[in-house]
Amino acid sequence: MATVTFDKATRVYPGSTKPAVDGLDIDIADGEFLVLVGPSGCGKSTSLRMLAGLEDVNGGAIRIGDRDVTHLPPKDRDIAMVFQNYALYPHMSVADNMGFALKIAGVNKAEIRQKVEEAAKILDLTEYLDRKPKALSGGQRQRVAMGRAIVREPQVFLMDEPLSNLDAKLRVSTRTQIASLQRRLGITTVYVTHDQVEAMTMGDRVAVLKDGLLQQVDSPRNMYDKPANLFVAGFIGSPAMNLVEVPITDGGVKFGNSVVPVNRDALKAASDKGDRTVTVGVRPEHFDVVELNGGAAKTLSKDSADAPAGLAVSVNVVEETGADGYIYGTVEVGGETKDLVVRVSSRAVPEKGATVHVVPRPGEIHVFSSSTGERLTD
């Protein structure tokens, strides 16, 4: 087990002037489960492959523990990698697949068998040790691939979208198994995914990348509560945070027919940048619907006393998930039509085509600079 350090690590592919990974700076603690997440092409898999030694590092350094491994070959890094496709040998049994790396390393048969059986017990694979991969389900094959990594007892686990080939239900159960297994083994793990739900549920910390640049690295809770910029705010959360550009008024921001109070330091910071508007972020669950007796509207001042409080939302689609309902609608802001998602009780879902008015709850507003995208509120 060991710490992992990306020290301004950079990768520029031949023939390109733009780095695929640009000055990546992350310190990963011993035994930590860190998830790299971002859209396709953001550099997350490239970062993992740089750590594995499968990609050259053109600038900066990578360290595992006290060792600088920047230019070491993969075999000398003491890492084990699990891929999206399981890469099992079809002609070998499960036991032979799991122990193959140890066999190549010259470990004696008795020790190999002992380590394979221990890993199989952890992964509930004991009864399948004599089977061939074709006789296993997708989830079982993925566990065999993990077992092959476990028996090597590496300092660092690397996982590159290992759940992508599994169906939705199996993905949920397997991700909980991987997270609990990592906590039991205590081995430092770097996990790559494009699925932010996976990232939020599995990682001790999450690192969000975009266009090769690190946007934010933090605990899942802090990242959800305090996204560093507009990209993170829109990427983390399902459904995503609503982002609406609204004008600054005295003491707050104009939200439809209501004035929502905002931290004065945030408004001053926006004014200092020359912004006349700010981008307000509100999670779907942090709206009150006026027509459903939402209490937040009563605390806000209104521009026009005879008009309903808040922002008028035209309901286009209603999704009912059983426990909750989600309103997918459109709003008119500054002459532009914007999409908005609001979570409501499944017992009080409006009709499609209806118009409802929404206001954000006090203290649940995120304010971002419209010009730079950076977070302005604490």
UniProtKB/Swiss-Prot annotation:
Gene knockout outcome: Disruption of the gene severely affects the ability of the mutant to utilize maltose, cellobiose, starch, cellulose, chitin and chitosan, but not glucose. The null mutant lacks (GlcNAc)2-uptake activity, but GlcNAc transport activity is unaffected. Mutant shows defects in induction of chitinase production.
Molecular-function GO terms, alphabetical: ABC-type transporter activity; ATP binding; ATP hydrolysis activity
ABC transporter domain mapped to chain residues: 4-236
Topology versus the membrane: Peripheral membrane protein
Keyword Repeat: no
Domain of life: Bacteria
GO CC terms in record: ATP-binding cassette (ABC) transporter complex, substrate-binding subunit-containing
Localization per Swiss-Prot or TrEMBL: Cell membrane
ATP-binding recorded as keyword: yes
GO BP annotations listed: carbohydrate transport
Enzyme Commission (EC) number: 7.5.2.-
Description of what induces expression: Constitutively expressed.
SMART domains: AAA (SM00382)
Top-level EC class: translocase
Binding site residues for ATP: G38, P39, S40, G41, C42, G43, K44, S45
InterPro entries: AAA+_ATPase, ABC_transporter-like_ATP-bd, ABC_transporter-like_CS, ABC_transpr_MalK-like, ABC_transpr_MalK/UgpC-like, Mo/tungstate-bd_C_term_dom, OB_MalK-like, P-loop_NTPase
Keyword annotations of the record: ATP-binding, Cell membrane, Membrane, Nucleotide-binding, Sugar transport, Translocase, Transport
Family: Belongs to the ABC transporter superfamily.
Subunit structure as annotated in this protein's UniProt entry: The DasABC-MsiK complex is composed of two ATP-binding proteins (MsiK), two transmembrane proteins (DasB and DasC) and a solute-binding protein (DasA). The NgcEFG-MsiK complex is composed of two ATP-binding proteins (MsiK), two transmembrane proteins (NgcF and NgcG) and a solute-binding protein (NgcE).
Known role: Part of the ABC transporter complexes DasABC-MsiK and NgcEFG-MsiK involved in N,N'-diacetylchitobiose ((GlcNAc)2) uptake. Responsible for energy coupling to the transport system.
Name of this protein: Diacetylchitobiose uptake system ATP-binding protein MsiK
Phylogenetic lineage: Bacteria, Bacillati, Actinomycetota, Actinomycetes, Kitasatosporales
